Structures are given as C-alpha cells and as structure tokens.
C-alpha cells in the first residue's frame, strides 16, 4: 500500500511496520484495522496550536488537595492578575486567599457549602446530626491513587458513606464557577456570561490521562465548558504553571535559599525561614488590592539566563510533589521540557499520615478508626488543630507544640478503653509526647520534625535521582513552589542537599504561584513549546507475517493470507520530545466499506522497546473511536481511508480525523475512562 501522507513530514522518528495492509476483522474483538502509512510525526504547528478564541477573560482554578482558589485576568489587560476575594473564616496565621478543599452535602446528598463555610458549618453541627451529613476533604488524591479510575469511582465521606467522585468534583467546580462569575459581574457592573470565559484547571503533571479526562468531564458536568466547545477549557499542569509565572519574577518577588550570591538581601547563611517570614509579612501588608502586576517581558531573573540554560521546578503541594525540568528559549522566553515530569505522593498530607500513625501508637488503631466514624466532626477539629501546629514547625524551634484534643476525643476514649488519655500516654512509651493539664498533647520540636522526615526524605531522594539524569546536569536554578514549600523544614533540607549545585529560589507568594501561572498559561497556551511523553503509546495492528522475524504463536491465517497479530504500532515513545503542534499521522481502513464506527484499543507502556501488545508492562489504557456516520458520499468507495491526526505535545492527548474520499471531518473520541 502506498504511503498516503501529505507533504510537510519531518521524516520518521521511529521504525515503521515493514508492511501494513488492510485485513478482515479479528476474532478477538478488535476491528480489523492496520495502518496504511508508516509511523511519521509531522510538524503542523500552524494548524494545531490552540486557536485564539474571543474570550473576554481567563479564569484559572487551582484545584488543590488541601486548598483551592481562583484568579483571573482580562484578555485586554493580561499584565493584571486578580486573585479571588478573601474568604470568610480561616485559621489564625494562615493566609485565606485560598479556601480548604472541603465540601459538605446535606443528608439528602444535595450540595450545601464549600471551603471554610463547609468546614465551619460541619464543626458546629450536633455530633449525632453530623453523622448524617456528608463531609469530604483532601479528596483530590483519589484521582492519583486509584488505578482503575472510572466515571463511577466512589469517594468516602467522613461518616463512612459513599458518594460518586464525579459528582463531588463537579459540585466543587460549579461552586468556583458561580463565585468567579459573580465577582466578574460585580466588577463589570453587568451580567458576565460563561461563554465569555476561558477556564483553566490545574492538575499535577504526574497525573495519568484518565485523571485528566475525569477532571475535564467534571468540568463539563459543572457547566464550565462542553464537549462541543472543548477549547473553552484548558487543563494546565501545576509545575508548568509555576514555571511560567517564575519567568516573570522581579528580584523583590523572590527569596533565595542557596549558598550562592544573595538575592533580595537574603542569603543562604541566614536562618532558613527567616527571609521567608519577612517576605510573608511584606505580602500581608500589601495584599489589599488582590491585583498582581506581571511583566510584559521576561522577569529580571532571566537576565542572568542564556539560551539553553536549565532549571528545575519542584511543586510541593498537599498531595503530590511534581518535578519538572525546563530549558529557556530566548528571546521570547518560550519553554522546552527536558525530562518527563516525575514525582509522587510526597505532599504535606504525608505529615498528617505520620501524625495519624503516632495517634495509633498512643491510643490504638482500633480506637482512632472508631473515633473517625463515631465522631467525624471532632476528628476534623483535631486535624485542624494539628495543621496549625504543623505550620509552626521549624528547624531552630526549641519550645514544645501544643495540640488541643477535642473534649469528645477525651470522653470517647475513656468510654472506649475504660481509662484516661493521660493513662494512655504514660503507657505508650512515646517519651516525646506528653499530656498537658489543659487538655493538650505537648509535642517536643524533635517529635514534630520526625513527622516531616519520611515525606521530606522522599522528596530529597526523588530530587537526587533526577539530578543524576544527563538532561538535568548543569541546572542553574531550582524553584521551590507550592503550599508545602512554605515549610522551613523542607526549605532547609533542599538547601542542604542542593544549595551548592544550583540557586534555590522561592517566590514570595509561594502558595499563589501556580494559580497566577495558570492564568498566564490560559492567556498564552503555546508558551510551552516542547514537552516529553510520560509513556509509550500505540495500538495493536496486523502486519504481514514474516518467517523468522515474527513468533509462530502470532501467526493468523485468514482467507489464505498470513498475518502477524498483536503487533504494537508505536505512536510515541516514553520520554520522547514532542513539540506543540506536532502530529502523529495514521490512516486506517474499516473492515467493511459500510462500517460506521471504528474502535481502536490504545496501549501504553513505561518502556520504549515494545514489539507486541502482549509484552510485559504493556497495558490497555483507552480507546480511539472514529464515528464515520455522515461522512460517506452517495457512492461508498470499496476501500475507505480514514486519516487520523494525534497530538501528544499538549497537556492532554488530542485527535482529529478526516475521511479522505469525501474530505469530511470524522468525529473522534479518545476515552481513557470508559474502555
């Protein structure tokens, strides 16, 4: 079969199947489809970079594990980023420009409230009444930890009841939609329509395709966009957003931790956290306007960068830590990803889990698990009390940290065990936690620091592994961003491990870095020019059987023709560099000319050298569905060719298709959730 690709090819990036012909349908459930053309990647940036739409405003939602918020910028004033209104409620000493990612449903499972409002209302409920309400927090991690994520995946509320995850995420996004549109309408003095808004939602870079698709489906259900107007919603990768914002930093907007030359008057020899504390005070004094000005040009920090210089972004949030390596392209300041995003579940929640394990050791796992179920609101109160003390942990702290135990904890423990909390502490042999007569757990600084150690050790180990990669050698900067980056213990660990290798920079308003960067990304989605594929992707096809090359067990004889089954036709390799707008072209032919739907299974692997879809480590991960309805002309050709164009250089995998005979567009769906 002749190569039917259009001109403009960059040439093959990978080995094409030696021969690929159309074939009858296979008996294993796949449609009998083989590629008509070899494996080319075509640069077609003019046609596939996100089109400029006539949106009046970009609204970014930073949907975090522990806290969330939104910011926006009018497209005619892209240098002004407005952060959402201050939230009612909040904890002493904690900035409330974000709100906790907590949601409360009524006993009838209707949406009641979100954020501080949900938390405070739940706190004030009678304990028996609270058992009927559905309170959820830190639920974003479910999308990362669930291996078989589907549209029907459940979440567990504080009272143990199950609720659909899609419903909860949609409720949360709908809440932010309503809040943002109301604020925009108030500011504009007239009703602001959703169609005027381009929405941006942030997700961790290490999330797999199903989790990204899940978030998009939740946004559709919340009414932010629709499948018919999918370009109204952009999925932004959190460390990329941070990187985009860091390009704009002025010297007075950053703190340097490394032992290199001082920036902004703070040097690496200062006490870790001291400069950061001063910076936060400066932010609090200047936070009234909620409007941040960003440079139209590259920020001052990039004046020290040359073409090809590299830097690492460490996005340390509540649930995950994302590590991204970027290279600067001057003079425009475009970015190129040098190594596929890496990371893991090493967020500040790890400290909470260690505290929970400590409570297990003192009071018994059976009691703690029962207390969560019987007194869910009191458990939330206890973790809120721990959160405020967690934020006070520091390397140089000498005085104890007191954590108030709710009265219901003390009372329920006595009923459960038959003796007091104080007795439990004495018998536990946990010397570094004492009982205070004021009803508090008194933790020594070393005890609190020990709770941080496993999580911080995992981050440092992951960073060390990353710095061993050839692509990451000679890194000039390390940007530490995300809510967990505020922790002086993490700052000290990063400084100690890498301060002599590169300059370690923390943006002053570190908790809003991703949010503001997501707005900038929504204004210019093409700023990241080159990304790396996290996995190897491809499909299973039939090739002509070649004696001596193909295994005998893969031989299929159909109508006298010898076929090799299960051949892995590779679209793109793991860690392969792919530019925004580069297209992977394939042409497929239906088993029968009258066939109206082609469904092709997509497979993935962490490995590059994949030959067959049955190789170890190869998994079915989704489907590519081509809907041929309405594309055929009056006379259906005996051999139909459907050309499919796939794009792997964006934050999501995208596809388009065309019926070559009629030049009509084919409806394409890529599904990583329902396959």
Curated annotation (Swiss-Prot):
Task of the protein: Adapter protein for SORL1, but not SORT1. Delays SORL1 internalization and affects SORL1 subcellular localization.
Segments for region (Disordered): 1-45
Assembly and interaction partners: Interacts with SORL1 (via cytosolic C-terminus); this interaction affects SORL1 internalization and subcellular localization.
Modification N-acetylalanine occurs at: 2
Family stated for the protein in its record: Belongs to the heat shock protein 70 family.
Bias (Basic and acidic residues) ranges: 1-13
GO biological process, alphabetically ordered: import into nucleus; inflammatory response; liver development; macrophage activation
Tissue: Widely expressed with highest levels in brain, kidney and muscle.
GO molecular function, one term: ATP binding
Annotated transmembrane regions: none
Keywords linked to the UniProt accession: Acetylation, ATP-binding, Cytoplasm, Nucleotide-binding, Nucleus
Superkingdom per UniProt: Eukaryota
Protein name (Swiss-Prot/TrEMBL): Heat shock 70 kDa protein 12A
Gene3D superfamilies associated with the record: 3.30.420.40, Actin, Chain A, domain 4
Record localization: Cytoplasm; Nucleus
CDD domains, per database record: ASKHA_NBD_HSP70_HSPA12A (cd11735)
One annotated Gene Ontology cellular component of this protein: nucleus
Residue stretches of biased makeup (Polar residues): 16-25, 34-45
SUPFAM superfamilies (alphabetical): Actin-like ATPase domain
């Amino acid at each position: 079969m002749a190569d039917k690709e259009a001109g403009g090819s960059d040439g093959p990036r990978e080995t094409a199947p030696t021969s690929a012909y159309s074939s009858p349908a296979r008996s294993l459930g796949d449609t009998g489809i083989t590629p008509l053309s070899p494996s080319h990647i075509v640069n077609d940036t003019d046609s596939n970079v996100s089109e400029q739409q006539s949106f009046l405003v970009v609204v970014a939602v930073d949907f975090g594990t522990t806290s969330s918020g939104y910011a926006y910028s009018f497209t005619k004033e892209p240098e002004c980023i407005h952060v959402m209104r201050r939230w009612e409620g909040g904890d002493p000493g904690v900035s409330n420009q974000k709100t906790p990612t907590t949601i409360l449903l009524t006993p009838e499972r209707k949406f009641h409230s979100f954020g501080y409002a949900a938390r405070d209302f739940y706190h004030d409920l009678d304990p028996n009444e609270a058992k009927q309400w559905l309170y959820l927090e830190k639920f974003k991690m479910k999308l990362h930890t669930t291996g078989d994520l589907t549209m029907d995946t459940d979440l567990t509320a504080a009272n143990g009841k199950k609720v659909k995850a899609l419903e909860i995420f949609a409720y949360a996004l709908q809440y932010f939609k309503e809040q943002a549109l109301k604020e925009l309408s108030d500011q504009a003095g007239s009703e602001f329509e959703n169609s005027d808004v381009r929405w941006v939602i942030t997700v961790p870079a290490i999330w797999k395709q199903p989790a990204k698709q899940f978030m998009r489906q939740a946004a559709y259900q919340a009414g932010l966009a629709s499948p018919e107007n999918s370009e109204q919603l952009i999925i932004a990768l959190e460390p990329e957003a941070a990187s985009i914002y860091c390009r704009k930093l002025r010297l007075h907007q950053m703190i340097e931790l490394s032992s290199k030359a001082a920036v902004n008057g703070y040097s690496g020899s200062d006490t870790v956290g001291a400069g950061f504390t001063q910076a936060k005070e400066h932010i609090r004094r200047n936070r009234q306007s909620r409007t941040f000005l960003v440079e139209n040009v590259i920020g001052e920090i990039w004046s020290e960068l040359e073409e090809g210089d590299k830097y690492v972004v460490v996005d340390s949030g509540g649930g995950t830590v994302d590590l991204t390596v970027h290279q600067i392209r001057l003079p425009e300041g475009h970015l190129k990803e040098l190594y596929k995003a890496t990371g893991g579940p090493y967020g500040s929640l790890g400290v909470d889990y260690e505290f929970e394990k400590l409570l297990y050791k003192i009071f018994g796992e059976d009691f703690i698990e029962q207390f969560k179920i019987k007194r869910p609101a009191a458990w939330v109160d206890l973790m809120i009390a721990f959160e405020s003390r967690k934020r006070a942990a520091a390397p140089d702290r000498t005085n104890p940290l007191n954590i108030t135990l709710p009265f219901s904890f003390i009372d329920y423990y006595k009923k459960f065990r038959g003796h007091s909390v104080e007795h439990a502490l004495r018998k536990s042999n946990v010397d570094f936690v004492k009982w205070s007569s004021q009803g508090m757990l008194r933790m020594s600084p070393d005890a609190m620091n020990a709770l941080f150690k496993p999580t911080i050790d995992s981050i440092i180990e992951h960073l060390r592994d990353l710095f061993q990669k050839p692509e990451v050698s000679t890194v000039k900067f390390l940007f530490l961003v995300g809510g967990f980056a505020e922790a002086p213990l993490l700052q000290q660990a990063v400084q100690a491990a890498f301060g002599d290798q590169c300059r370690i920079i923390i943006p002053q308003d570190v908790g809003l870095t991703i949010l503001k960067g997501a707005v900038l990304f929504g204004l210019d989605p093409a700023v990241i020019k080159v990304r790396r594929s996290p996995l190897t992707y491809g499909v299973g096809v039939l090739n002509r059987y070649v004696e001596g090359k193909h295994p005998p067990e893969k031989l299929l004889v159909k109508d006298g023709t010898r076929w090799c089954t299960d051949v892995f036709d590779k679209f793109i390799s793991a860690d392969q560099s792919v530019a925004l707008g580069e297209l992977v072209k394939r042409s497929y032919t239906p088993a029968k000319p009258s066939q109206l739907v082609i469904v092709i299974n997509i497979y993935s692997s962490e490995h590059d050298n994949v030959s067959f879809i049955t190789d170890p480590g190869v998994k079915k991960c989704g489907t590519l569905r081509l809907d041929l309805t309405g594309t055929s002309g009056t006379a259906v050709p005996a051999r139909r060719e459907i050309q499919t164009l796939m794009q792997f250089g964006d934050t999501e995998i995208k596809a388009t298709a065309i019926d070559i005979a009629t030049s009509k567009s084919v409806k394409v769906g890529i599904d990583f959730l329902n396959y």
